Structures are given as C-alpha cells and as structure tokens.
Amino acid sequence: MTENKTSYNSKQVEEKIRSFWDKEKIFKFDGKSKKKIYSIDTPPPTVSGEMHIGHAFSYSQQDFIARFRRMSGLNVFYPFGTDDNGLPTERLIEKLKNVKSKSMKREEFIKLCLKTLKEITPKFIQDWKILGTSADYDIYYSTIDDNSRKLSQKSFIELYKKGLICKKGFPTLWCPECQTSVAQAELEDKEMPSLFSTLKFKCGEKDLLIATTRPELLGACVAVFAHPEDKRYAHFIGKKAKVPLFNFEVPIIADESADMEKGTGVLMICSYGDKYDAEAVNKHKLEPRIIFNLDGTLKIKSYEGLKIKEARKKILEDLKEKNLVTEQKQISHSVNTHDKCGTEIEFLPTEQWFIKILDKKKKFIEQGNKIKWHPEFMHKRYDNWVNGLEWDWNISRDRHFGVPIPVWECEKCNEIIVADEKELPVDPAEIKKKCPKCKFEAKGEKKVLDTWMTSSISPQIASSLINEKVKIPFSLRPQAHDIIRTWLFYTLTKSFLHENKIPWENVMISGFVTLGGEKMSKSKGNVISPQEVMEKYSADALRFWAAGSKLGEDLDYQEKDLITGKKFETKLFNASKFVFMNLKDFNGKKPKKLEKIDELFLRKLNSLVKSVTEG
C-alpha cells in the first residue's frame, strides 16, 4: 500500500497478496526447522463442486488458529486434503453426468469418477485459496489417491490380523436408494407423518387387533408378541395367529419386551422392520421371511415390484376392502433415514465387514477424556454418542467407487486371503488368486470401504507426505459438530486400535451457519454462496463475519455483518493512509526517548497481545 491510493480495492489487494504468499512460500512447513511444531489435522472437505458458506465459516475459524500459532513463533504444519472417495463422490458424479453407477460397468464408472474429479478439484481447491486459508497446499492428499488407498488398505489388514475386523451375515442397516449397507453414524432421525392402523389378525374365530405403521411388512410377519402379565391376551399365548391378507399362521409368544401401553399392547414381529425385530427373531429362533429386494421393492405375490410406500398404500387399500382395518389415526414419529439421500432405512440380511467396537465403549470414553475440548460442552456430545452405540462399525459399502477391501475369499472352503502389503494399493476384483489352503479359486471382494475408513486416518496420511516428521498426537483437530459421531469418533477409534494413542491433544468444534435462524438447504432455497459474498464484499469481510461467533455456536448469516467488515477494511485503509501521509521524513531509527503517547500505545498493544495470547 502506498500513500497515493485514494480508495481500497479489496479484490486487487487480495489477489496481489495471494500471489505473494504463493511465490514466497509463506505458509510452507519447514521440516528442517528446530522450532516447536504445531500440527493441525485439517478437515479434507468433501469434493462437491464448490465451497459452501459453512466451509467458509469453519475454515476461517481454524485458519485464525494457524496464523496465531505462526505469529507465536511455532512451525505450523497445516496440510490440505480433499475427501473424494465413496458414496458422496458417487452421488456427485451421478448428478453431474446424469448416470447411475448400478447401471454401468464397475470399471467404466470408476474411470468416469476419476476423470470428473480431475476436472473439478482444482477449481474446488481454489475457493479455499481465495478465502485466504493459509494451508501448505504442497502437502496435499486426496482420499482416493494411491497413497491414501494404500494406507487405508494397510489399516484394514492390520486390524484384521489383530482380530478386530470380521465378516458377518445378518440384518444390517440398508439404504434402498443407494443400495448399500450403512453405519449407525450415517443415520439421521427425521420426524415424519404416518398412519397408525389397527388391523384384524385371527386366532381361531376370535379377532386379535394389532396396530402398526408398516402394513407392508405383513408378508414378513413371523410372530406376534404379548406381555406375559397382560391379562387381556393370556388366553392367546401359545396359539397361532392368522396374518390378514396373507393367511399364513404365526406363533403368539409371551415376551416381556411387548409394551402393554403402546397401541393394542400386541405387536407383530417381522423380518425385519427394525433392530428390535432382528433381536426378537434371533432370540426366539424364528424362521425369517424376506420380502424386500435390495432396491426396496417387494418380491411377494400381488405386490411384486412395488416400492415400499406404494406397497404400503396398496396393502392398506386391500385390507380396507376386506374390512380388516378397525381404526386409523394420523401420527408423527421419528424415522431412521440415510444422511446422504434422506431415504428411510430398512433392515436387510446381507454379508458385511465390521470393526468390533461395542466391547470398547469404556476405552473410547477414556480416550475422549484425555483430549482438551473447545468448547468443553462438545465433549458431552461425544460421550453421548459413544454410550449410545448399538452396532459395531459397518465398514463395507456395496458400491463401485471407493477404496477396495483388500481380500479374496475361497469359493470352496471360504478361506479369507488378505493382500500382502507389497501389493497395496490393490483392487482384488481385478486380480485372480488361488486359495493357499485348498488351491481352489479365490474370488476378489467387490465391496469398497466406508469413506470414513480412509478419512479416519487423516493424521497418518498427512504425516506420510513429509516422511512422518509429524506424528500423533497432533496439536489440533478443527471440525464442525455434526461429524463428532463420524470423523472425530472414527479417527479416535483408529488411533486407539492401531497405536493406543489419542490422535490430537485439542479438538476445536465450530457451529453451523443459519439464515434467519434456520439451517440452510438447497430444497428451502436459502443457500448463500460464499463465492458471491467474497466477490461483493471481499474475503476479509467474510472472515471478519466468521470471527463473530464463539466456538461451537451457530452463526446467523446477516448482510449487515459483511457491510460492517467492509467498513472495517476501509477504516484500516484510511488509518494507514493517514500514517503514510505523516511519515515522509521518517527514518526508521529507534528514538532515544519515547513520547508519552507512544508509550501509551505500546502499553495498550502489549496488554492486548498478552490478553489474546493467554485467552
């Protein structure tokens, strides 16, 4: 800046400064420096085409910390990565290219994903540079690059050899839209309207009334439960109930899990409506009836090919026609949906790979206690999640694009053959192997790993790029609160299972951006583009706005705050212009004696630096 400038051109200045940063490698990590290292486990944003306002908010906050630590004399390790494997990327490519992965050959779809990512990623990263994020972009990784795939597969192999990974076939959480199994952490509870219908089952000549929100599961009914102390149904216990419409009989069983206060007090057990059903079928060794295909359509006569909601409607119509519905009422209830697409989750019997975590909940709580949480109340959210775990971590996905699971299974004796570390990264579906046990052909696994299996080793991936000069625990993990249950928990899990260490010393949690107090969403049409904001007001004005929130608190987007930020820039410019106007004869030498006003300014400055540093 020089004194002859009459107005502040933020766009011109920011471009000039960014060029200077790039040319001079201002933010480059110095691996040879003797300075104390401050390491940041930078969140790799999911490649989605462009940065959203939530990114701009949270990455600005973490960048304040990175810059502050540099100003404090530390050697800051601040890498940058992108998360671009797994289901989120598949759905993006399907949308951009108007294709469906399931209707394409596996190798063709993978090729399309990689080609498209190569096209869109540079522009995506540029948004972070324009924002002023002071990462070292030379220390870059993508979660689908060769190195990340290698380390992710290596992690799988190590945990498998420790006996911490197993393959199990039983009712798993299943998304009919994405046609893949999902983990508990990917569930999102949504309040949805529904019909609570009371239906007539028959026990001999008597009616047995059962209320349900899911009449489409009648064909999957395997038993009826009543509480052993419920006198209303004592005479039914041990008998058979005839299922309406389908006319097969199921046992009426006394079970203490039946809620006498809910509905009629009697419930139907189906294979499978929810986790309760799965446990009940297993407990009483009931023979399951599977009526859903993997795409969520029915495969029973009269309703074959109908999607779940279509079947629900048609079955209710048929029940009413036969006078088998005695009562209906509108209710609102919480439903498990898939956080990636919003589809209601089903329970379908499939074979999947799991990391055993349920028996280590106490250990995970202990590990969480070793970390400093900023703000502290976010620690409670972590504890609540761990204590509420009901499933082992499902790490396999029935999709095309992702990190392949590095195993083969013998088609004759079912021996599991894991890849040799020298082979990594490997795609078993493309390589044939012989079973070392029986010499029969072994089939390569086509499932891919949950994307969190890779991003949960982000500290190790980043460290590998600088020959592991930085090791866990890192100094800081910055992230948003919505992924405490996924990225934070899974990273802590992996670090504990692999090295018995915490992954970071500090966790910094940011909130969401709202508009008028509401969460932003494309469906509501209330999304703010940070690119447009920076074009109109400047990156510094946006960062000024992002600084206006306490950690962990949501920040409402208000244009007046951007205007205030822009005015603040102008004030700084005018103040500096005034200084330059009065420095024409300034020689820069240290004065023998300070003026009183200079002493006052320095005291104020030192006091501010001290309070900010200690704060």
Specify the residue positions occupied by each region the protein language model found:
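N-terminal, positively charged nucleic-acid-binding surface of large information/translation enzymes
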Residues: M1-E229, F248-E249, I253, C270-K283, ...
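Glycine- and acidic
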Residues: M1-N4, P43-M51, R106-I110, A135-S142, ...
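Long, charged, mostly alpha-helical binding arms that flank functional sites
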Residues: N4-Y8, L87, K95-V99, E119, ...
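Gly/Pro-rich turn-and-neighbor structural signature
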Residues: W21, N147-K162, G169-P171, C175-C178, ...
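Short coil/turn segments at secondary-structure boundaries
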Residues: D30-K36, K105, I130-T143, L164-C175, ...
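Short, glycine- and charge-enriched coil/turn segments that flank and shape catalytic ligand pockets
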Residues: G31-K36, L96-M104, C203-D207, A234-H235, ...
